[in-house]
C-alpha cells in the first residue's frame, strides 16, 4: 500500500513538471530497481549495531577488484596523495555486489534516482501546487490530513536560513 502511495504521489509531482507518463513510469521503475538491489545487500539495523562484525580489512589490490569500473587509484591519489595499503570495509555484502551499482548497466538506475532527487530539492521554492504535491506522501505517512497553509509554509521557508540566529536572539 505504501509503495503504491509513493508511486501515485511521485507520479503526480512529476506530472506537474511536465514529465510524460512514459518518462514517469520509467523513472519510477528504475528507482525501485535500484532500491531492490540496495535492499538485497545493505546491512540491517541489527547487523549494523554489531560493530565487531563490521571490521573486514582488505588489501587494497583485492578491494579494487570489487569495483573495477571505479577509478580508485585516481581518487585516492587526488584525496590523500597515495593509494592505501588496506581498506576497511564495513558493508562487505555491498562491496561484494558492487558491480550491480558501479557499472554502465547501473547508470540509468542512478540517473533516475538523481532526477527524482533534484525534482524534490526545489519543490518548496516553486508553485504552491508543487509544494502541496511534494508533501503528499509524507503527509500520508504521518497521518496529516492536509498540507500546511501556504502563508505558514512561506513563513517557514523564509525563516529557515535564520532559524538558529532567531533562536539565539530569542533565548537571550
Q: Positions of the model-derived regions?
A:
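Noncatalytic, helix-rich "gating/capping" subdomain that lines the substrate-entry/channel surface
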Residues: 1-172
Amino acid at each position: 500500500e505504501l509503495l503504491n502511495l509513493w508511486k501515485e504521489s511521485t507520479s503526480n509531482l512529476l506530472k506537474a513538471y511536465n514529465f510524460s507518463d512514459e518518462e514517469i513510469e520509467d523513472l519510477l521503475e528504475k528507482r525501485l530497481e535500484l532500491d531492490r538491489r540496495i535492499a538485497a545487500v545493505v546491512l540491517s539495523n541489527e547487523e549494523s549495531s554489531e560493530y565487531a562484525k563490521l571490521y573486514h580489512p582488505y588489501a587494497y589490490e583485492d578491494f579494487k577488484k570489487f569495483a573495477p569500473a571505479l577509478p580508485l587509484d585516481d581518487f585516492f591519489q587526488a584525496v590523500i596523495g597515495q593509494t592505501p595499503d588496506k581498506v576497511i570495509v564495513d558493508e562487505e555484502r555491498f562491496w561484494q555486489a558492487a558491480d550491480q551499482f558501479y557499472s554502465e548497466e547501473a547508470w540509468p538506475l542512478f540517473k533516475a534516482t538523481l532526477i527524482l532527487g533534484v525534482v524534490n530539492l526545489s519543490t518548496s521554492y516553486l508553485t504552491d501546487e508543487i509544494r502541496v504535491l511534494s508533501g503528499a506522501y509524507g503527509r500520508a505517512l504521518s497521518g496529516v490530513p492536509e498540507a500546511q497553509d501556504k502563508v505558514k509554509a512561506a513563513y517557514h521557508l523564509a525563516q529557515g536560513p535564520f532559524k538558529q540566529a532567531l533562536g539565539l536572539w530569542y533565548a537571550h
